[in-house]
Amino acid sequence: MTGILAGKVALVTGASSGIGEAAALALAEAGAAVALSARRAERLEGLVARIAAAGGRAVAIPGDVSSEADATAAVEETIARLGRIDILVNSAGVIQAGGVESLPLDEWRRVIDINLLGTLYTCKAAIGPMKAQGSGDIINISSTAGRRAAGIFGPYSTSKFGLTGLTEGLRQEVGGAGIRVSIVEPGATATEVAGGISDPTMRAAMSQHVAKDGAMQPEDIASAILFIAALPPRVNVSQMLIRPTIDTAAM
């Protein structure tokens, strides 16, 4: 495909649904070849078919970013199958309701392993190849919960605050090598993420909240990701906060 990202290769984690899926479609439409990573292989294959039907190129790389081996393999396989890696979109994420006292530690670990450490693993694997190319874009998807603590979503908010520190530190570390590092912080967005909340009352409340007419759609966030990736190499949007026009909650 031709487009503003023609010749570029992107890896998108969390590509089986929500923001990751929308980002993959937007990047492919803009001309990038896209590697799709997530745990749900059948959804990835469906997305590969959709992109191919529209004239784009995509490959599926199933895996779990909370596994360092899987996350590293996603980067390595992207390069092996598509030739390089120009854009890394870290969109894989989960949410859980609860606080320090109420939520078991294994739930805290699961959220932090996916949202924070999973991003660390893919970033670490991508830095070397991007340095060798002299360029690259790393775009980490966070949340407004990474700007203002949301006590009822303790591990989620904690992981997103950590992601802010990781992103800014990495930007300082690799900017001199021509690698741009950005964080995108969406407010309420209509995705499937609330389905992972174990408490049924909180799950229903969160699902209802993101289903409101004023909630943003994954395509809205994908447009922001595309904007960042398409900017001239001299420009790095280090942080982008995106809220619904009618913003009724912290997240």
Spans of model-derived segments:
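The beta1-alpha1 cofactor-binding region of Rossmann-like NAD(H)/NADP(H)-dependent oxidoreductases
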Residues: 41-42, 62-74, 105
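Active-site helix of classical SDR
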Residues: 123, 159
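Residue(s) in the substrate-gating loop at a strand-loop-helix junction
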Residues: 143
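Conserved glycine-rich Rossmann-like NAD(P)H-binding loop of the short-chain dehydrogenase/reductase
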Residues: 32-47
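Substrate-binding pocket helix/loop in short-chain dehydrogenase/reductase
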Residues: 99-100, 107-112
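C-terminal helical subdomain
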Residues: 179, 183-184, 203-248
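Conserved glycine-rich cofactor-binding loop
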Residues: 9, 16-17
